[in-house]
Swiss-Prot record:
Sites where the protein binds NADP(+): 189-194
Native species: Desulfitobacterium hafniense (strain Y51)
Pathway recorded for this protein: Porphyrin-containing compound metabolism; protoporphyrin-IX biosynthesis; 5-aminolevulinate from L-glutamyl-tRNA(Glu): step 1/2
Gene: hemA
Protein name: Glutamyl-tRNA reductase
Pfam family, one: GlutR_N
Reaction it catalyzes: (S)-4-amino-5-oxopentanoate + tRNA(Glu) + NADP(+) = L-glutamyl-tRNA(Glu) + NADPH + H(+)
Length: 443
């Protein structure tokens, strides 16, 4: 089985494409089961966040596995394959593992070092496990990846600087108004992103926080947590007329705020300036709303332009994280190679024992009656011949296991001694020629 990753993110696809292929949380289990029905895939994990959509899987045939996932994403997004392919990246074998390590470390995020991604990856893997869709190799890859993410955050300062998307949204509001104190801030949605945004707003000195959500109970719970005020969803227009800043992060599948609605609100406000920050995917606010007089609209892609005052410190932390990542990749490769090398050595030793027994039986039959001492000497000599003959190839294979040519040496040894492939590890075979069998795009 070979690991593969197919996906798109904020670097490869605009929000218009990302929102087409994104999955609502309620859709993920169904999507996982549909993917599981595809015979080319095994051990499937689906990661869907506001900035990325990625499918991790194991497959016996890399080309086929990649192809069926691309077709699946095209169908889900109601796009032609040729239209979506330009936005997709593909990682296979060790590149797939390295990519996941980068993701959990926060090195592949829009805001480098963000803290949310570690939990999002853990949740994605947990959903797969609950549906019994993980296999041994995917389990090992994700367990190692989560350990890498935790190690990076414990040994570097990559998460000690404000680096989440929700924090960046607050920073954008502060840069626009100079300060959020004294401003009326409306948060649409009561999920994790909304809670994080409210946390950063209060930490920045906001004294009026309004929360509106379709579930009044959830809105009240979030508002109470931050001494804010819950607004019934039916009174959203009134809240929009009151607010200075609106940060929208719902899980709606359609636009919550459209131009005609916002036009009425702005008339009530008498065109008083309003800042809208849409950090939802799919977007909550229709892009044409930003064309209205007095309205400034930023969507999640616009957050890239926010100046990060901690850039230098974060870049240094990223260098440290990169070193940790490569160290952990080395350990993973060594572990994975052992899955292939150890069974090969066992199979080689077993082959030696089989040949020894066959030749001993033949020799003893030809010799006729001999005493116990003579038979013991003959058996000892046969054991020594096999042991000495296999010593060098086994020792050299162990030494080569930790090099880039390890799999090549292993395959050569298997072919030379005609070892039974059924005796070898089911995870074996990420060889040099396999690694070259599929192009891996950057993403």
């Amino acid at each position: 089985m070979f690991p593969i990753t197919i996906g798109l993110n904020h670097k490869t696809a605009p929000v218009e494409i990302r929102e087409k292929v994104s999955f609502h949380p309620s859709e993920i289990n169904k999507a996982l089961m549909e993917l599981n029905e595809l015979s080319a895939l095994n051990g499937i994990v689906l990661l869907s966040t506001c900035n990325r959509l990625e499918i991790y899987a194991a497959t016996p045939e890399v080309e086929l596995g990649v192809s069926v996932i691309k077709k699946f994403l095209a169908r889900h997004g109601k796009l032609r394959e040729e239209d979506i392919n330009q936005y997709l990246y593909v990682h296979t074998l060790y590149d797939s593992v390295r990519h996941l390590f980068r993701v959990v470390a926060g090195l592949d995020s829009m805001v480098m070092g963000e803290t949310q991604i570690l939990g999002q990856v853990a949740e994605a893997y947990e959903k797969s496990s609950q549906l019994n869709l993980s296999n041994k190799i995917i389990h090992a890859i994700f367990q190692n990846a989560l350990a890498v993410g935790k190690r990076v955050r414990s040994e570097t300062q990559i998460d000690q600087h404000p680096t989440s998307v929700s924090y960046t949204a607050v920073e954008l509001a502060k840069q626009t108004f100079g300060d959020v104190q004294g401003k009326s801030i409306l948060i649409l949605g009561a999920g994790e992103m909304s809670a994080l945004t409210a946390k950063h707003l209060v930490a920045s000195g906001a004294d009026t926080v309004l929360v509106s959500n379709r579930s009044m109970q959830r809105a009240q719970a979030l508002a109470e947590e931050f001494s804010g005020r819950a607004i019934p969803y039916e009174e959203l227009d009134t809240a929009l007329a009151e607010a200075d800043i609106v940060i929208s992060a719902t899980a709606a599948a359609h636009f919550v705020i459209k131009p005609e609605r916002m036009r009425r609100v702005m008339e009530q406000r008498r065109q008083r300036a309003l800042l809208l920050i849409d950090i939802a995917v799919p977007r909550d606010i229709h892009p044409n709303v930003g064309e209205l007089e007095g309205v400034t609209l930023f969507d999640i892609d616009d957050l890239r332009g926010v100046v990060d005052s901690h850039q230098k410190a974060r870049e240094e932390a990223a260098l440290q994280a990169g070193r940790i990542l490569e160290e952990e990749m080395g350990r993973f490769v060594k572990w994975h190679n052992s899955l292939y090398v150890v069974p090969t050595i066992v199979a080689l030793q077993r082959r030696g024992e089989e040949v020894r027994e066959i030749m001993l039986k033949s020799a003893l039959n030809k010799l006729g009656p001999i005493d116990e001492k003579q038979e013991k000497i003959i058996r000892s000599m046969a054991n020594s011949i096999v042991t000495h003959l296999l010593h060098a190839p086994i020792a050299n294979l162990k030494e080569a296991a930790n090099t880039s040519q390890g799999h090549l040496y292993t395959e050569i040894l298997q072919n030379l001694f005609d070892l039974d492939g059924n005796e070898l590890s089911p995870h074996a075979g990420w060889s040099v020629h396999h690694a070259a069998s599929h192009h891996s795009n950057q993403g």
